[in-house]
């Protein structure tokens, strides 16, 4: 018989070229800022822009907060890595100290669905226009994130490195806030022990639920896409099948799943088979 090719179902989406005017407006906002902060989302992975994002952060001396799904975009022992932003209170003090919020590939679905609490100016760098309205931006540059970040790196001056101490202080405050007393093995200590024992290239999966907020702050990730979690819709029962899939895709890497009783029982049949 004959073989017939089917049409490609994946759309061929090309990023628009960033406008020179948009780039100049973005650069002007960065030049005017003394304390910029980078809020980095999953779009950074889609455009393979992790390296250029870190390069810009180092050039500006700006602290970096990533969303849960974007852990590993900046290695988590980097001095400018502050932690994860969830849209809650834990990161509010750090973000409020900045005088310019630069969102990079940020999908507001990863944040809590409530009003944006910061009066600070926002510069959005995105691959497509932000239509959700949850994060109101003063300026937005649209295009390939890797290209935009590389261009901005060359046209803005070096920053004052305020982010090194700011990120360090934030990490210390998060550690203190999560280090609650326990008579036995606490969840946070279990995560810390796992991170100490397991190799640096371990892939971690994490279920939805309150425990996820702890894991995303305590577990350290050292490469893009080495931390997999169900965020946005936040469906439970993800961690175990996610870990099995990760192991099949990367049999040479160790994999760990962080889950609770509900998430485990929803997927326990996957372990049986």
Placement of each model-derived feature along the sequence:
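Generic structural signal for well-ordered, non-membrane alpha-helical segments
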Residues: 16-19, 23, 42, 46-53, ...
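Conformationally flexible catalytic loops at phosphate/diphosphate-handling active centers
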Residues: 1-32
């Amino acid at each position: 018989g004959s073989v017939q090719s089917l049409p490609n179902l994946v759309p061929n989406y090309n990023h628009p070229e960033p406008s020179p005017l948009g780039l100049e407006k973005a650069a002007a906002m960065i030049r005017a800022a003394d304390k910029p902060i980078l809020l980095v989302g999953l779009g950074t992975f889609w455009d393979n822009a992790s390296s250029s994002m870190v390069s810009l952060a180092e050039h500006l001396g700006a602290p970096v907060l990533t969303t849960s799904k974007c852990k590993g975009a900046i290695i988590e022992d980097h001095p400018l890595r502050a932690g994860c932003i969830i849209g809650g209170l834990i990161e509010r003090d750090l973000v409020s100290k900045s005088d310019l919020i630069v969102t990079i590939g940020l999908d507001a679905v990863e944040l809590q669905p409530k009003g944006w609490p910061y009066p600070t100016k926002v510069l959005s760098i995105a691959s497509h226009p932000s239509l959700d309205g949850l994060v109101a931006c003063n300026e937005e540059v649209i295009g390939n994130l890797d290209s935009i970040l590389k261009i901005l790196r060359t046209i803005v001056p070096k920053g004052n490195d305020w982010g090194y101490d700011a990120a360090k202080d934030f990490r210390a405050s998060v550690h203190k806030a999560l280090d609650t007393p326990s008579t036995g093995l606490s969840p946070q200590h279990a995560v810390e022990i796992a991170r100490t024992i397991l190799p640096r290239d371990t892939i971690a999966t994490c279920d939805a639920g309150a425990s996820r907020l702890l894991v995303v702050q305590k577990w350290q990730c050292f490469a893009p896409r080495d931390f997999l979690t169900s965020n946005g819709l936040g469906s439970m029962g993800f961690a175990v099948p996610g870990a099995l899939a990760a192991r099949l895709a990367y049999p040479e890497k160790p994999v760990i799943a962080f889950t609770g009783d509900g998430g485990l029982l929803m997927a326990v049949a996957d372990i049986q088979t």
